[in-house]
Regions:
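Intrinsically disordered, low-complexity terminal regions
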Residues: 1-159, 163-306
Length: 306
């Protein structure tokens, strides 16, 4: 099958583009600004650029892959993005001979794509919003927060200081950060793996209707961040949660809290114990909360845990 020819656009001002050829994957690299990726029920992929400050965006469509980036920041995998900042004093580096620093740029873009599209985002100081995507979503961010709504594909997010909020995500969720936080609201995927150094984790699980699905697998690790997990009742998991010097709070009678001074643990089995819930932190607190049967109130960390 003959591959489609490469098509390119240089976008220096607000503009709308429609891509008649099929798009199976989008790759976006942004330095400052906002990037929105939204699933569409029908129609071709579309790009709306609302604002460009700095060098023009470089848009490429080839072989089902749509790339939105900059000409001096080509897509070359996550390693290529890292190399753009390393090996040079980039804060003093001027692009295009204009005297403008390479990082002094921003753009506001919205991509509307088929729901099955795979999404790869790499950002520095840019805010990301992804909604309704069923393909795999991969986010790499130095700073800047990301909001994920209604994703059903596998999600991987890696940040330095940016936080991630996931709402009604049903796919597997993996998160790695240094100081960014993770908030999961109405999480129905049942598979969450996250680790942080100092970022807090707030996990609200809506897992009441999981008949015939794989067991719940929650694994959270932090050094100094707080961890709060709200589980539906009845829950179904083996629980192992521990903190070396932080406090603990437990809302389940079937779980046992051990330890008085120093290390504390929450252990036991909820329901048949077919799933697993593991949470570990060194100096942060851990709270296991019961999710009300009715519409739940927003989850918040209680800094007064024992």
């Amino acid at each position: 099958m003959e591959e489609s020819a490469q098509k390119t656009w240089s976008v220096a001002e607000p503009q709308k583009l429609t891509f008649e050829e099929p798009v199976a994957e989008v790759r976006v690299r942004m330095v400052g600004g906002t990037v929105n990726v939204v699933a569409a029920d029908e129609g071709p992929a579309r790009l709306e650029v609302a604002e460009v400050d700095g060098p023009p965006l470089y848009v490429v469509q080839e072989g089902g892959i749509l790339t939105v980036s900059y000409e001096d920041l080509p897509w070359n995998g996550s390693q290529g993005f890292k190399e753009w900042f390393e090996g040079k004093p980039w804060k003093a580096w001027s692009s295009s001979g204009t005297g403008r620093k390479a990082w002094e740029r921003s753009a506001t873009v919205t991509l509307t794509v088929p729901a099955a599209t795979r999404v790869q985002l790499a950002t520095v100081g840019a805010t990301a919003f992804v909604s309704g995507i069923g393909g795999a979503t991969d986010i790499h961010g130095v700073s800047g927060d990301a909001t994920l709504v209604g994703l059903s594909g596998k999600v991987k997010a890696k940040t330095v200081s940016g936080s991630v909020e996931a709402q009604s995500v049903t796919g597997e969720l993996g998160f790695h950060t240094v100081s960014g936080g993770l908030t999961v609201v109405d999480g129905a995927g049942g598979n969450v793996r996250a680790d942080s150094v100092s970022g807090d984790m707030l996990i609200d699980l809506a897992l009441e209707d999981r008949a015939g699905q794989s067991p719940v697998n929650i694994s959270l690790t932090s050094v100094s961040g707080q961890v709060a997990i709200r589980l539906p009742h009845p829950a179904d998991a083996r629980v192992e949660a521990s903190t070396a010097t932080g406090g603990v709070s437990n809302a389940f009678d079937d779980l046992r809290v051990s330890g008085q001074l120093g290390a504390k643990r929450i252990t036991g089995t909820l329901g048949a114990g077919t799933g697993t819930l593991r949470a570990t932190t060194v100096s942060g607190s851990i709270a296991l909360l019961r999710r009300p049967a009715a519409q739940a109130a927003p989850l918040a960390l209680d800094k007064k845990v024992l």
